[in-house]
Amino acid sequence: MSCTEAPQPIPAGTTTTSTIIALGPTGRLSISVEGDLECLVCREPYNCARSPKLLSCQHTFCAVCLKLLLYVQEDTWSIPCPLCRKVTAVPGGLICSLRDQEAMVGRLALPCPEVRLCPQRLVGSAASATRPANWTGEEEQDTVSVNRVAARRLAVHLLLLALVIVLILPFIYPGVIRWVLAFVIALALLMSTLFCCHPQSQNSNWLCPRTLFCREQKQTQITSIA
């Protein structure tokens, strides 16, 4: 009478390594090792700089850790295995002369799916996410206020110019030229006054340089954040 023992549960936190044997298309056996693709010493994942190297005891570690463990013993460069303490000779002290763990190198060489990013869409989404709801209203108010100030300055300058012309022209240009110049100055003064009283009549698409500069600065800040 044979008794069967129940399998013991594996404690939590234990890292297991499974080996899968499959029949390849050529009729040969292909062995794939599944485990953590990281060094057992530094716990860093294997990559081009930390290539997995195989010691004589068949234990695998990254090239960086093996280079730190390299020492000279009896005029020979050697590396003690951190697990079993077996010494592996390294010809010339070159870590690259050690064999690579082909199973792990093959898994590292698997192509990863490419992720394509569109900077224009990222900037657009970030700008739309950070732009407040009253963005257009603030821009229109800034444009109207700046245009109003500019029109007032123009009106003051034209008024001063008209006073100067009225005082100087009788002594320099008598006759019809004086009245023509006075009419032109009065017309310009009237137009500037209309602009001051009715700034909404201007096209809202005409933005002043200060508003354009502020908009470009905000867009630059949004792009840098994205």
UniProtKB/Swiss-Prot annotation:
Sequence intervals crossing the membrane: 157-177, 179-199
Pfam families reported for this sequence: zf-RING_UBOX
GO CC aspect terms: endoplasmic reticulum membrane
PTM remark: Polyubiquitinated. 'Lys-29'-linked autoubiquitination leads to proteasomal degradation.
ZnF start-end (RING-type): 39-85
SMART domains attached to this UniProt entry: RING
Membrane topology category: Multi-pass membrane protein
Broad class of the protein's primary localization: endoplasmic reticulum
Enzyme Commission code: 2.3.2.27
Effect of gene knockout: Mutant deletion mice demonstrate an increased bacterial burden in the mesenteric lymph nodes and spleen compared with WT mice. They have also a more severe phenotype in the dextran sodium sulfate-induced colitis model, which is due to a defect in autophagy in colon epithelial cells.
Keyword Plastid: no
Domain commentary: The RING-type domain is required for ubiquitination.
Binding partners and assembly: Interacts with BNIP1.
Listed name of the protein: E3 ubiquitin-protein ligase RNF186
Annotated gene: Rnf186
